[in-house]
Amino acid sequence: MSKKRVHELGKQLKEQGIELSNQELVEKLHALGYLEVKSHSSSLEDDQAHAAYEKILAERKPKPAPVRPSGPGFVVRKRAHVEPPTVTAPAAPPPAEPEYAEPQYAEPQQAEQAYEPEPQEAQPEAAPEPVAAPEQPAEAAPLAAQAAPSPGAEAAAPAAPQAQPAQPAAPVAPPAPSAQPSAPQPPAAQPRPPQPPMPSRPPPAGYRPAPPPGARPPMSAAPGAPAQPGAAGQPPRPPVDPRTLRPTSTQAVVISRPLVPVRRVTPPTSARQQFPVAPGPRALGEVRELKVVPGSLGREREFIDVSRDKRRGRQPGRPISEEQAKSLSGKELLQAAISDRAYIPIRGKKKKPTKKGAKTQITEKAEHKKVIRIEESISVSELSQVMGVKASDLIRKLMQMGKMVTINAQIDADTAAILALEHGYTVEKKGFEVEEFIPEVEVDESKLVIRPPVVTVMGHVDHGKTSLLDAIRQADVAAGEAGGITQHIGAYSVNTPQGPITFLDTPGHEAFTAMRQRGAQVTDLVVLVVAADDGVMPQTVESIKAAKAAGVTILVAINKVDKPQAAPERVMQQLTEYELVAEQWGGTTIMLPVSARTKQGIPELLEYIALQSEVLELKANPDKLAAGRVIEAKLEKGRGPVATVLVEEGTLRVGDALVTGVHFGRVRAMMNERGEQVDNVGPGYPVEVLGLSGVPVAGDEFDVVEDEKAAKEVAQHRATKQRQKELGGVKKATLEDLFAKAKTSGQKVLNLVVKADVQGSSEAVSQALEKAATKKVGVKILESAVGAITKSDVLTAAAGNAVIVGFNTKPESEIENIASQQGVKILMFGIIYEAVDRIREEMAGLLEPIIKEKPLGKAEVRQVFNIPRVGQIAGSAVTEGVVKRAGHVRVVRDRKVIFTGKIGSLKRVKDDVREVAQGFECGIGVDGFSDVKQGDILEVYELEEIRPSLD
């Protein structure tokens, strides 16, 4: 079931003409029972949202008002329930001025009568028959249902009868005529809009206070009727224009509020309470009539006590004379109408003081704000937050597009643009411009100088690559290498008669493929060394492919020609299979016979290298910012990260800020291959650099930038992209992956933590160990890094139940003790193939051993002896092989095995022996079996464990 957000519900209500702010809508939903709604971004189920929409629409949608009569001076007023009063004629002639009598209100019997709306068209009723008065026809006045009874009639009316059960409100009958004919009375003025009481303010000019009871003349029954002379012959009162007393729209709304009768259930009034008492608190049982009006200053609500006006013998809010009305303003008229009223405020809930701020409004974003700027990718969660859309909707749309993603998955800019377009957004790419920090400099031919050639020596292991370089450099590097093989890539600068040459020595072992590939990528020329007595080998072919892939020139040096088994022609023939044809045979490849031991052919080799460099026209600009490639990297204690770099362009100086991969730093020191510190290095020379923030990856490019801040920004940008790629990559499961997972479901895995001296060795060892995995046992590298073995490595291995493999590195102090406490095994190696062989043994140890039964001999039971405290002993004669004390035994009777166990004791005469050979007699005790009988055969054997094969 889909969901709908609160602000979407607000938009639907707005279309229906109901405008609610987000806060008001949330409060309204809380009042309806949806307490889980927290803000305008919260979601509701479709059925819940529809139900809330219908409730709010039914409550807030204005209903058509009933047709009410209108006219000048008339105000529509609602009453809860009004009983028609019984009018009687006065027993004596009225005084000079008729007085106001307090109207009598019917009291409810049990409960307050429910309010029912009056009908739109009310039919007038006939007035009840007056007592002791001449019967005259009562003419119904217009809108009699809304007209109030005259004060004169109220004065003569007896107590009203008890209220009947709730019935529809009937129109009030017009007052009956009295002894003296009276003119029609104007309608009683309705209550005015409430205002806060102002006791300290003096009455307005021209306002006459209310007269005492009996001092006012009766009011006319009909509006606008001429006034009649009083009983004492006083002059008639001038008619009052109703338009002068017509209330405003605000007053009409307030005046139209219903009166709320309030009753307290108390004991009957005693005789003492019937006499006047001093002013003070009202006695219990008093009935007060209250009116609900908006509170002063618009706060909460208030009750107006209108009982005080009734006790004083006048109607609340009675109209004033025309002369007084002319001298008062509208505001003074309103104050006069509501004066002398008692207010009973409702105590509201005290609100905590909060900062007054603008309410959150549902608005539409401007067009310039509907632009999403992203780099190469963005996560689904970030895109949903920017657009204000549910992430589940975006994931559903991506699934329809055929992309299985999660909320944290990264999507490219094109896919994000498609999703954004559906919601009215546009996507702009704001890719990180690396060129701003690493600008490309135009080549200035006038500043180019000749640089030394970079020559990489490649070939199979033990074919004499390092020995050949030693002969050229007149050094003895090969003698100090572990196992006599090169396991690091070495960079050397050699001064020859033909000029300086930079040599890169690469390993020949199969595990160092990545090193050979890096050497081929940075070189200008490849010297392929092939042993004359061994010929072309697998790593020779691999080196040829790497050189051709890099597009560099290959020069073949056929080494070890001084050996008796040397066959240079056979080597040249084998190389033709790989499209390397010697110049002697009409080809283009230079092939020279050399000998590292006798230095035969070395001068010719150097001359050909110089010749090829001249043909290639190797030049570079030394005045620009330096750039190059990382050849090797390592972590040394006391020196930190150390990178061997090859400068390809520009000049690298101490203090330069450089960036390589995700690492950056400032050059603190530089040293050449002889360990001498240098201040600057030109193009074509190798050097060791100190000062980086971490160990870079061998093969990465490095660039010098203006300052360290720029280098840090570039490195952080690359690190962010790498992390996004690792976390947000979407990998589709293929059928082959499922089959591979099913095959390896029962496979055992050997976890390893690899630490090496340099980055290249760490990479090579990890790849070699991973290749050692078989179908029965797999290999998983938990961590591969450079540097000494630390406590962190031990804890990582302990958590992953792994073995630590150290290659040309040693553990720190007390690390071995911590490893023994944690139960972690540390294996140290200096030669890579020794590490591979030892790890295969560890892999075989994970397999369950195979138990094999090996027969030893047989013995026949001749006699059975029962020895106290020892048990049953079978006197037997060894008929085949030998019976050993530590062997297992099967008891066979009638060619059926009835028991299998171990030999408990073996004696010859009275001496304990370890074994008894064939032809001798002995006593054999079987553990856990005491039912040996004469004639049983005891078959003795032993169990041996056989380690299973990894293949």
From Swiss-Prot:
Residues covered by region (Disordered): 58-255, 305-329
Domain of life: Bacteria
Region (G5): 595-597
Annotated GO CC locations: cytosol
Record-linked SUPFAM superfamilies: Initiation factor IF2/eIF5b, domain 3, P-loop containing nucleoside triphosphate hydrolases, Translation proteins
UniProt-annotated stretches for the region G1: 459-466
Region (G3): 505-508
Disulphide-bridged cysteine pairs: none
Protein name as catalogued: Translation initiation factor IF-2
Organism whose genome encodes this protein: Anaeromyxobacter dehalogenans (strain 2CP-1 / ATCC BAA-258)
Organism lineage: Bacteria, Pseudomonadati, Myxococcota, Myxococcia, Myxococcales
